[in-house]
Structure formats: structure tokens, C-alpha cells
Amino acid sequence: MKLSLENVNLNSNSGPNSFGQKLFKYMPSCGVTFENTPEPDAYLCFIESGRATHNAPLFQRLDGIYFNSSFDYTAQNSNIKRTYDMAKGVIFQSNFNKELTFKYFGPHSKYAIIHNGADLDLINSIEKIKIDKYENIWSCASSWRPHKRLKENIRYFLEHSGPNDGLIVAGNVEDKVKHERIHYVGELTTEKLFSLYKASRFFLHLAWLDHCPNVVVDALACGCQIICSSAGGTKEIAGENAIIIQEDDWDFSPIELYNPPPMDFARKHENIWNVNREYDMTSVSKKYYNFMKGTLNG
């Protein structure tokens, strides 16, 4: 299959683009070649297309839509929906993402839910960072926008960690909570993140209404126990031993995303939603290929 990627920057390490790098690495084992040719067998577009038409079937990888009531989410979604309506098939990153999109755009006739995957070859080649100062390392990593709830991550750590545990926060942070057991390391390369995850016992991701964060899949693949919110799609990929903080159900109505509610950590429980047990990119790539090939042949 000759596949042309659209709206993917293989030189960027943002969430969608880092996943694009993984597809580019692993899908050739399925018989896929990535070509910038005027006559591909199909296009795979991440999120939205800038083209009016395509000369081959279009597949959309959709990792989220806009619903923040503080912005004009209808305008923000306009081209995403246009791409959705053009697409022969749509790949959602989580059940949550599918239900959200169906609410705003309507059902799609051909879709698959394929959770994000981890580059196990790269992970297995990396040694964990040596940190002897603490009994247990906790970590978290994100682009720290308000709904990622860094301060809730920190509060959970301070309330549940042992006196000899340390928290390492990756990503740029402007409003830092100062504490002798909390360390801010800024933006890290993928390799350094994996090295940190491999040294961590716990990975905190208490983001509100997140779709299917790559950092959680990567941290799980590195051996971390995940602690996350029930709100959104993260719980689907957090693993069977994840700790879930229960939050109120959301009916998908527009909401102030950057004004998340405080969390009640007493509402924690085991993960009853975990549905993703094949998070290595070899399996994920095969799912992408099988969905696109089956749709083209159907």
C-alpha cells in the first residue's frame, strides 16, 4: 500500500507528530510505503486536511475536537468536520474521543478505535536514569495548560507519597510549587523522558477530559503505575493496575475546559475501564493497516 501522510511534521515531537514518527517507523513492516506521490493508494491525514479534494481515498486520524465554551469551538472545528465528512474512514484514539465526536459531528459510517502505541524497540534500548536520592520516583510530563492540572498532580504526590519519595516534573512550568522533594527539569528529549519513566514507580496524569495521551502509553510501557482521572479517555489506556480518581460524568456539552474542577482523591479506585492491552507499535500499526486495507477493499 502506498500511503501519503498529510498534516504530519516528522521533525516535531508534539503528541500527534510523535505518533506520526512511530507509524512511519513501524508501518513498513505491514507492507506500507510512505510516498509523496501524486497517485497514492490512500491518504492518512492527522486531524484536518488543507486540501479541497483528494485523488485517492482519505483516512482521518482524529485525536480530539474542540469543545471549550470560552472559545468559538464551532469555528475551530469547522475544517476538522469538513475533513471528517470527506473521509472514507476515521480512526479515533479512544472510545471517549469517538463518543465526543459523534455528539458534535454525528456518527461516521466507517470508523475504528485504535489506541496509541509505544515504540518498544526504542524503550528497550534505553537505560533508566540513576537517582539514588529517593526511595520512589514519581514523574509527570505535559504541556502544562490549565486542564492538565499540574497543581493537582503535585497535591496528590504530597498527600500520598512517602517521606523519602521525589517528584520530577517534565515540561515547561511557569507557576512552580516549591518543595524540597519536587524537581522541575523542563522540556526533555524522548530518550530522556523514557529514561525518567523507567526510573519512576508512579506516573501522574490527572488531566481533565484528555483524549488518549501518548505520555501515558509511553510511561506504562516503561513500567510505571499510572494515576489518572476517570474523566476523558486516559483511563482506557492506563493499564489494569492504574489508580483512577473518579470524577462526575460529563454529557459532552460545551464546557470551560481551562477551568477544571478540584479533585476528590478519596474517590480513587481500581481501573475498571482498561480496554487497551496491545499498546506496542507493531500491533497498533497492523490495526491501522488492516482497517485501511479492509475499508479500501470493502
Residue spans of the language-model regions?
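Active-site proximal beta-strand in glycosyltransferases
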Residues: 42-70
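Short alpha-helical donor nucleotide-sugar binding micro-motif in glycosyltransferases
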Residues: 84, 195-200
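Conserved donor-binding/catalytic core segment of Leloir-type glycosyltransferases
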Residues: 130-148, 154-159, 167
